[in-house]
């Protein structure tokens, strides 16, 4: 059996920035005194004239990024998700999204899996915040392959993009032939009894859950939803028609994230049971990332339980 490849999506982000730097001299990268952690430090070493560090001033960084974008540059502004989406929300809304500027926000260390840094750094509200902003695209890749493709797709998109990356090394889901398109989900496993729609590191957990459910005689469809906004309504509706029940899985508060986005589509277009796996509207705590994911129910076992419950509601 081949060894499982595990890579943090933040590492893929850093490598993709260097790739873009060689291709496009118009690309500028910014950070807020976290270059080593966000992996933008690699870009800094390669292209020092196109890297700017704002210091611990995320709000200023977003405004400077907006100014650079207004002059025709494509700017990647990087920080931890807590400080990018949380602290700099107003600047993202008014200076970047309102004028629809080409600023791509690289938000690393998202979710519970930040681990020992604790509740102050475990941002489980960022997707909800960014979903509420007009013009904003939200990407949450499942692995390093998809993370790279998200960055490459973001630079081609005209307007702001919020990209969510993790600290924890996660198993590779996709091979090098995988094609990513903004606004499109993709079916990883087909099934007839229940649909599991997952995003980020929960995609791998969804695949494990589907295998375990299969052993119990349950056929689960698994959909990877890397684009949270604009959500792929077509694949959601198609999945509901085929299975009649949905479970969403995300490393985010169940309020305002993937679960809410999917529920909105289902409620409006094809009513069916939808159950959500995610952070149950609570704050995090300090601890090893893998242990915290289990404590907060962000694992295959909880997806399986919700899937069985959803089937009973049909």
Range-by-range predicted roles:
Residues 1-164, 169, 302, ...:
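Thiamine diphosphate
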């Amino acid at each position: 059996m081949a060894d499982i490849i595990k890579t943090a999506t933040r590492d893929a982000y850093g490598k993709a920035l260097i790739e873009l730097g060689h291709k496009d001299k118009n690309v500028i990268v910014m950070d807020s005194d976290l270059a080593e952690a966000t992996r933008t430090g690699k870009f800094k070493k390669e292209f020092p004239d196109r890297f700017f560090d704002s210091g611990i001033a995320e709000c200023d960084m977003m405004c400077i990024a907006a100014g650079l974008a207004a002059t025709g540059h494509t700017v990647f502004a990087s920080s931890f998700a807590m400080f990018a989406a949380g602290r700099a929300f107003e600047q993202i809304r008014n200076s970047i999204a309102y004028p629809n500027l080409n600023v791509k926000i690289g938000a690393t260390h998202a979710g519970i899996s930040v681990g020992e840094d604790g509740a102050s750094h475990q941002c489980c509200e960022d997707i909800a915040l960014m979903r509420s902003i007009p013009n904003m695209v939200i990407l949450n890749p499942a692995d390093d392959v998809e993370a790279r493709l998200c960055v490459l797709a973001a630079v081609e998109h005209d307007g702001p993009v919020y990209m969510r990356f993790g600290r924890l090394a996660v198993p590779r889901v996709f091979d090098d032939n995988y094609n990513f398109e903004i606004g499109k989900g993709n079916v990883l496993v087909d099934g007839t009894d229940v649909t599991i729609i997952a995003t980020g590191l929960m995609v791998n957990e969804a695949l494990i859950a589907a295998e375990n459910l299969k052993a119990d005689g349950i056929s689960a469809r698994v959909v990877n939803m890397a684009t949270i906004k604009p959500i792929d309504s077509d694949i959601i509706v198609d999945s509901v028609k085929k299975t009649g029940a949905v479970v969403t899985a995300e490393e985010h508060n169940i309020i305002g994230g993937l679960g809410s986005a999917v529920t909105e589509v289902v409620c409006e277009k094809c009513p069916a049971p939808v159950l959500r796996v995610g952070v149950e509207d609570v704050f995090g705590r300090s601890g090893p990332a893998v242990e915290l994911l289990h404590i907060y129910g962000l694992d295959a076992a909880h997806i399986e339980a919700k899937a069985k419950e959803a089937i009973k509601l049909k």
